[in-house]
């Protein structure tokens, strides 16, 4: 079983760059305080790095 990480959206996506909003959607985040559990892959890490200022990560 691969490693998973929990990602929580902490800030709103209103007024953000369209690419960053799409990254949040790609991660499965819809609203503030929404948490999803994702596999720890390079693709997921790349999306998290783009929106690091709007999310909180728990390993």
From Swiss-Prot:
Tell me the superkingdom of the source.
Bacteria
- What Pfam families has UniProt attached to this entry? Ribosomal_L30
Keyword presence, Ribosomal protein? yes
Keyword Mitochondrion attached? no
* InterPro entries the record matches: Ribo_uL30_ferredoxin-like_sf, Ribosomal_uL30_bac-type, Ribosomal_uL30_ferredoxin-like
Q: What cellular component GO annotations does this protein have? A: cytosolic large ribosomal subunit
What the record says about family reads:
Belongs to the universal ribosomal protein uL30 family.
Q: Which PANTHER family match?
A: LARGE RIBOSOMAL SUBUNIT PROTEIN UL30M (PTHR15892:SF2), MITOCHONDRIAL RIBOSOMAL PROTEIN L30 (PTHR15892)
Protein name as it appears in the record: Large ribosomal subunit protein uL30
Q: Species name for this entry?
A: Aliivibrio salmonicida (strain LFI1238) (Vibrio salmonicida (strain LFI1238))
């Amino acid at each position: 079983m691969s490693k998973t990480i929990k990602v929580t959206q902490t800030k709103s996506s209103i007024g953000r760059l369209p690419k960053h909003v799409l990254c949040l959607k790609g991660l499965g985040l819809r609203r503030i305080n929404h948490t999803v559990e994702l596999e720890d892959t390079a693709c997921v890490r790349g999306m998290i790095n783009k929106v690091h200022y709007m999310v909180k990560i728990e390993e």
